[in-house]
């Protein structure tokens, strides 16, 4: 009986502590750097977006993630590359916000500008952008304005830096959002 109550108390404490929320926020809007500082920022319809992740719960997603994959059969310089920035600390949004940028089988080069395309386009060699706010998705499209400039890319050091701007369209409606002054400096 004593072990049963000890086990029950341990379970309750584990649940309480795992649901505690502490916010890990980036310090201020980032400047343009090329050092792999793991910073990200932008303005969505003139509202600042910075990565911020609460701890607790069971979500494995970090506030800022970047990854690269060299697919089988790809030419040597072609990679899949993704950046995901999450903000679930802002109390104005029930389910939080996120920005995702995806290079799909691209040859990434320093000081090159890429136009955003459509996520629904099944072709390779494209770059896409998505903004999610309270479970509503806004996506890049080749008919809308938007581009990303890679200001620094070093696959051996695993660093990518750049800036971006885009007009994104709601997936199931006519509404749009504008992302301006987007900057990032990430390691992968």
Stretch-by-stretch model annotation:
Residues 34-36, 142-144, 178:
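Residues that act as N-cap/strand-start positions at coil-to-secondary-structure junctions
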Residues 21-28:
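Bacterial lipoprotein signal-peptidase II cleavage site
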Residues 52-53:
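Short linear motifs in exposed loops
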Residues 57-155:
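Surface-exposed helix/loop patches within compact recognition domains
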Residues 145-188:
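C-terminal or internal capping secondary-structure element at the end of a domain, subdomain, or sheet
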Residues 1-20:
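Sec-dependent bacterial lipoprotein signal peptides
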Residues 29-47:
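Post-signal peptide N-terminal segment of mature Sec-exported envelope proteins
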Residues 44, 85-89, 166-172:
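Short acidic, glycine-rich loop/turn motifs
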């Amino acid at each position: 009986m004593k072990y049963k109550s000890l086990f029950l108390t341990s379970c309750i404490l584990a649940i309480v502590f795992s649901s505690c929320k502490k916010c890990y926020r980036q310090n201020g809007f980032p400047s343009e750097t090329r050092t792999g500082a793991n910073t990200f920022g932008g303005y969505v319809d003139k509202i600042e977006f910075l990565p911020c992740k609460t701890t607790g719960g069971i979500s494995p997603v970090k506030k800022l993630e970047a990854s690269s994959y060299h697919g089988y059969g790809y030419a040597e310089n072609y990679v899949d590359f993704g950046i995901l920035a999450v903000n679930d600390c802002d109390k104005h949004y029930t389910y939080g916000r996120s920005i995702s940028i995806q290079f799909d089988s691209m040859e990434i080069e320093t000081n090159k500008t890429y136009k955003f395309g459509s996520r629904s386009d099944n072709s390779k060699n494209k770059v896409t952008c998505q903004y999610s706010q309270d479970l509503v998705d806004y996506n890049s499209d080749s008919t809308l304005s938007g581009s990303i400039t890679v200001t620094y890319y070093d696959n051996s050091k695993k660093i990518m830096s750049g800036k971006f701007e885009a007009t994104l369209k709601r997936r199931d409606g006519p509404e749009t959002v504008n992302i301006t002054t987007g900057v990032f400096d990430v390691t992968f």
